[in-house]
C-alpha cells in the first residue's frame, strides 16, 4: 500500500509503477488540502511532477555539491579565502600539501572516492562545454568522450592530493580521516554534519566553477509511493501517513535528530541557528551558490551511475583507459 524507496529505484520500481498505473496520483490530495500542499517542497513538484501528476513525496531534501573544510588547517596553510575557481582549488590543495610536509604532518588535502566522485564530476561537467551544461540542466547525461575527458583530467589532478594507496574509502572512512585531522577537505553533503566532531572547526563550501561561479546541488530524490490499489480506504490512510511525515512536528525531529534537511518549506532554519549553527551555515552556503543542480541520482540513470562509480577509481589511477571508461559508462 505504501512503499518507502529511500531514494532508490527511479529507473526500476518507480518507472514500472508509473507505466503500469500502480502508483496513486497525489495531486488530487494536494489540490483538496492546502495545508498538505504547503508542506510539499517546490523541488518535489518541479522535478517529479509529470503531465500534471505526482507519484512520490519525500520528507527530506538532499543538499550537497560541495565539501566540508577544516578552517584551522586552511588558516595554517595560508589559505585566506574559499576557492572560487578550480585553479584556486588546486592551489589550495598545493598549499595544504606543502604546509603538511613542512610541519612533518601527514595531512592530505582531499580524498576522491567512488561515493563522492559523481558529485565532483557533475560540477566539473557544468563548465566543460555547452553540450555538457545542457546535459546536466536537462537531466540527460548522454555525454561524449569530448565532454568527459576534461572532467577526468581535472579529477586526476585532484586525486594526486589524496591517499595514493587507492584504498576503497567510503564516506565514513573520509569522515574519520576528517575528524582525526588527517584530511583538510571532506566531500559530502549537509547530512554529514552529524558525523563531524564538534571539536573540528568545520565549515562548508560549494564547489568552485568557471569565473568564480560556484556550484552546489539541491534535490528531492525518490521517496514514498502510494500504491494505486483501488482500495480507497487504504490509499487515504497512506496519504494521511505522508501528511504526518511532512508535519512540522516530524520535520523538526528529522532536522534535529538526524541532521538531514527536512523538505517542508514550513521549517525555517533561522529558528534553529543557535541549536545547530554548523548545519544552518552549511545550508546557507549551498543556497548561496551561484548555480544549483540536481544530485547525481537525479541526473544519471541507475546503470550509468553504477558504471561510473565502479570504474572511476581505475581510470583515475591509470589502470583503465579513458576511452574504454566512456564506452563502459553507457553499457
Predicted regions and their residues:
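Short helix-initiation/N-cap motifs at beta->coil->alpha
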Residues: 86-90, 166-179
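Long, aromatic- and glycine/proline-rich binding clefts that accommodate carbohydrate-like moieties
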Residues: 205, 255-309, 313-314
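Short, solvent-exposed loop/beta-turn-alpha elements that line the ligand-binding surface or hinge
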Residues: 25-40, 81, 100-101, 109-110, ...
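Paired acidic/hydrophobic, glycine-rich loop segments that form the ligand-binding mouth/hinge
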Residues: 1-4, 184-189
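Glycine-centered hinge/linker elements that transmit conformational signals in sensory
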Residues: 92-94, 138-168
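Extracytoplasmic/periplasmic solute-binding protein
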Residues: 49-60, 65, 90-140
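Extracytoplasmic/periplasmic substrate-recognition and gating elements
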Residues: 76-77, 160-161, 197-261, 310
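Hinge/lid segment of periplasmic solute-binding proteins
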Residues: 8-64, 205, 274-276, 287
Amino acid at each position: 500500500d505504501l512503499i518507502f524507496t529511500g531514494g532508490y529505484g527511479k529507473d526500476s520500481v518507480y518507472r514500472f509503477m508509473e507505466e503500469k498505473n500502480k502508483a496513486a496520483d497525489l495531486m488530487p490530495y494536494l489540490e483538496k488540502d492546502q495545508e498538505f500542499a504547503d508542506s510539499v517542497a517546490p523541488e518535489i513538484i518541479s522535478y517529479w511532477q509529470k503531465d500534471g501528476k505526482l507519484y512520490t513525496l519525500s520528507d527530506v531534501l538532499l543538499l550537497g555539491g560541495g565539501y566540508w573544510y577544516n578552517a584551522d588547517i586552511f588558516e595554517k596553510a595560508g589559505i585566506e579565502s574559499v576557492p572560487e575557481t578550480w585553479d584556486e582549488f588546486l592551489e589550495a590543495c598545493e598549499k595544504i600539501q606543502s604546509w603538511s610536509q613542512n610541519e612533518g604532518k601527514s595531512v592530505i588535502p582531499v580524498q576522491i572516492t567512488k561515493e563522492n566522485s559523481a558529485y565532483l564530476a557533475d560540477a566539473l561537467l557544468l563548465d566543460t562545454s555547452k553540450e555538457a551544461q545542457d546535459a546536466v540542466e536537462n537531466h540527460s547525461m548522454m555525454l561524449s568522450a569530448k565532454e568527459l575527458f576534461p572532467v577526468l583530467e581535472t579529477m586526476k589532478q585532484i586525486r594526486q592530493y589524496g591517499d595514493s594507496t587507492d584504498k576503497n574509502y567510503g564516506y565514513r572512512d573520509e569522515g574519520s580521516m576528517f575528524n582525526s585531522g588527517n584530511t583538510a577537505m571532506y566531500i559530502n553533503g549537509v547530512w554529514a554534519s552529524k558525523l563531524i566532531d564538534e571539536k573540528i572547526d568545520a565549515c562548508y563550501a560549494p564547489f568552485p566553477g568557471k569565473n568564480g561561479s560556484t556550484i552546489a546541488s539541491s534535490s528531492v530524490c525518490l521517496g514514498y509511493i502510494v500504491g494505486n490499489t483501488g482500495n480507497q480506504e487504504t490509499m487515504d490512510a497512506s496519504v494521511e501517513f505522508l501528511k504526518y511525515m511532512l508535519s512540522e512536528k516530524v520535520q523538526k525531529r528529522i532536522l534535529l535528530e538526524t541532521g538531514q534537511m527536512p523538505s517542508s518549506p514550513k521549517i525555517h532554519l533561522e529558528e534553529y541557528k543557535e541549536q545547530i549553527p554548523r548545519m544552518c551555515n552549511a545550508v546557507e552556503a549551498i543556497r548561496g551558490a551561484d548555480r544549483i543542480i540536481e544530485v547525481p541520482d537525479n541526473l544519471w540513470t541507475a546503470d550509468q551511475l553504477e558504471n561510473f562509480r565502479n570504474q572511476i577509481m581505475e581510470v583515475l589511477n591509470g589502470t583503465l583507459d579513458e576511452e574504454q571508461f566512456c564506452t563502459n559508462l553507457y553499457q
